[in-house]
Amino acid sequence: MSDYKSTLNLPETGFPMRGDLAKREPGMLARWTDDDLYGIIRAAKKGKKTFILHDGPPYANGSIHIGHSVNKILKDIIIKSKGLSGYDSPYVPGWDCHGLPIELKVEQEYGKPGEKFTAAEFRAKCREYAATQVDGQRKDFIRLGVLGDWSHPYLTMDFKTEANIIRALGKIIGNGHLHKGAKPVHWCVDCRSALAEAEVEYYDKTSPSIDVAFQAVDQDALKTKFGVSNVNGPISLVIWTTTPWTLPANRAISIAPDFDYALVQIDGQAVILAKDLVESVMQRIGVSDYTILGTVKGAELELLRFTHPFMDFDVPAILGDHVTLDAGTGAVHTAPGHGPDDYVIGQKYGLETANPVGPDGTYLPGTYPTLDGVNVFKANDIVIALLQEKGALLHVEKMQHSYPCCWRHKTPIIFRATPQWFVSMDQKGLRAQSLKEIKGVQWIPDWGQARIESMVANRPDWCISRQRTWGVPMSLFVHKDTEELHPRTLELMEEVAKRVEVDGIQAWWDLDAKEILGDEADQYVKVPDTLDVWFDSGSTHSSVVDVRPEFAGHAADMYLEGSDQHRGWFMSSLMISTAMKGKAPYRQVLTHGFTVDGQGRKMSKSIGNTVSPQDVMNKLGADILRLWVASTDYTGEMAVSDEILKRAADSYRRIRNTARFLLANLNGFDPAKDMVKPEEMVVLDRWAVGCAKAAQEDILKAYEAYDFHEVVQRLMRFCSVEMGSFYLDIIKDRQYTAKADSVARRSCQTALYHIAEALVRWMAPILSFTADEVWGYLPGEREKYVFTGEWYEGLFGLADSEAMNDAFWDELLKVRGEVNKVIEQARADKNVGGSLEAAVTLYAEPELAAKLTALGDELRFVLLTSGATVADYNDAPADAQQSEVLKGLKVALSKAEGEKCPRCWHYTQDVGKVAEHAEICGRCVSNVAGDGEKRKFA
């Protein structure tokens, strides 16, 4: 028997079947670095329209976690897809390098500044520590396959950036947005510093809940207001609070102007409460026998005075919109030094912003004899005992509630009035302008807009000063007596900025005021405060984007971070940009959800459900991690687990196998010589290229909409359904058995070439390593890297006017599916082995029959059977299978007649009819020794 194997065009490629990504990717990265791939891309894109995604700086502390990976991969997918869409899209990664977490790390190792080290040495240690953290994180980010200017990132501790942060503050001062005041700020007694809103987390805490009576100073005036004369005992207004320790700072009682307030007689005294809360308060304080003597509107009680239960003064009743009927008594204890609402209403009524608490959380001397020097969280019991002793305590109980805590220490924080510097939301219209700017930004997902609008509408002034060592100095001089800013503040700040640009922030602390103030130096003091780190990162649109040459003066098109950044970086950037320039710093803002485990639980080391990106890359490879990120809907929580990553690896294999099939069957194809013109191609091949064209339209739309899970789904559908289970199956016969240089085979290779050229580019933003690998095996002249080019433009499709148009092949796909069902059943019944052992008869109604008949003898190649005939639907025998999908189709199957050809494996009746080739069929004889078979349709 002759060996006909050598006459077949068997697939062959050096592109490996197994990805082995964990082993192969580092080598590719080394090549990208050695070649300066990022530089090559920049050179290739020079002069094109720009798209600037500005990197929100991660904090330079600790190893990267899965959330970091999600963030950087999403950014990289966008940058690469924009590059392929014809944009010059530089990517400059950044790091946030100042602030408390770094100070704490350095403190742990070396002690606090001023103990063993000077503050200057401490700052140097902080700078050193941040630099090592940046290096560690940078290696991991690069390993993810993220392309960027990694050798020239921006760091908020770069001298030039530090100087530009000072300049940003100068611009805000020049525009009139800065003011100084004693205001209640979030204060951590462990950090001994004010905290930004974004540094506050909420945890459940058990606190005492108390009802306290403030006796009226003028009892008769109250009787008159309520229209009563007979009251048994003193009259009091009752407040409710869960922070007894703040009572020494009480300066008023807030009530709502429009609520009804009742005067309620209880045993031996009368109390004033919101009428709607009388029943719940009576239940709480254990009183069943009470009488409502009268009611008035809250507005009637304004400015009546009540005696503080244990301090030696009385306080007014004032009107506030923040009073609710959700809980309590309808009368709110008001301490302007310990709460933002209290502060706002206190300003309105000219109340003292009293703050009897020191930075360490203990009462200052002279507060109250039994409280001086006591920690406020230990003072609740003392205050409650005092109230009891004075007969002012109506009720006490424990309650659990959500309480603000320091993100770093996880300990409860307090509101504490301290002298601080603020960016005012309203003194120069910053709030109104910011709300206007928000409307001009595209928020993705769109609920982000309402979220940030409500945050901006309700946020207090931004406290930008911190009492820290490692941070950008505010660089201000204030008058010793008046505490007013120096009249030449902007000029002086520029002078400081120039010095910082040369020597870093230490230049401020080394600066002798005389050097720039001359004779005035004795009248002014240097402000020792540093800037909130959110000011550092929030000003990068100015300190980085405006000055980096690769951005060429363009503003950022996009900011992309986790959804917690509405109150963090998106907010601080919006505030600073609007205060400086009157406009938002971004055109689009995209947010992604947090990572959770397979069961939807938050990642936590204590539960042991964290997924380390380093482990994933070392086991499965970065491309699997990238595919998981892209295939997950980032608008909600992003679930990740070993099982989910395994599914991503399965999807990856399907894509890789498709790419490998294309490459293996392009063996021996030279596009410069072997390409077949579209009009001369086999119809099915043109259909396949048309499928790629339709897929490309969908994929490009999805990339444009940042809808990456749609990109992956469409890519998978193309690989698995349109190619894998239809086209690639059908062409194997023609590809392997036709004459090597025949139009039938070259037509097929032409289609595969166009498809491969498109596919490798669709993959590139997501499966960057694999796309680079595929690119290296594609035939024909090309640039060195897929990333420097643009989407493939060589695709074409069938015209709708053609008889065998897309709709024709869509119907054929359905017919093929129905035939497969019948073959599967016959295989299960052991009537046939493979599909080539079968012959089918398709009983079809006239319209479908005409389409099937048009394919002639080539119908069998589409159905992967050795025989296929078409007959009238009404002639179908009883055992023919009715299609559920196509009502006008029945399928009957029989065993194929004739012998099996050892070369093409088809069963035919002309095997051995040609003496010189006695073992093979006539078609194979033609392909081996004759002119080769002609194919028109399939």
From Swiss-Prot:
It comes from the Bacteria. Its cofactor is Zn(2+). Its main location: cytoplasm. Binds 1 zinc ion per subunit. A motif ('KMSKS' region) lies at residues 602-606. Its EC number is 6.1.1.5. ATP binds at residue 605. One of its GO terms (molecular function) is tRNA binding. It is found in: Cytoplasm. The modification N6-acetyllysine is found at residue 183. IleRS has two distinct active sites: one for aminoacylation and one for editing. The misactivated valine is translocated from the active site to the editing site, which sterically excludes the correctly activated isoleucine. The single editing site contains two valyl binding pockets, one specific for each substrate (Val-AMP or Val-tRNA(Ile)). Monomer. Catalyzes the attachment of isoleucine to tRNA(Ile). As IleRS can inadvertently accommodate and process structurally similar amino acids such as valine, to avoid such errors it has two additional distinct tRNA(Ile)-dependent editing activities. One activity is designated as 'pretransfer' editing and involves the hydrolysis of activated Val-AMP. The other activity is designated 'posttransfer' editing and involves deacylation of mischarged Val-tRNA(Ile). This is Isoleucine--tRNA ligase. The gene is ileS.
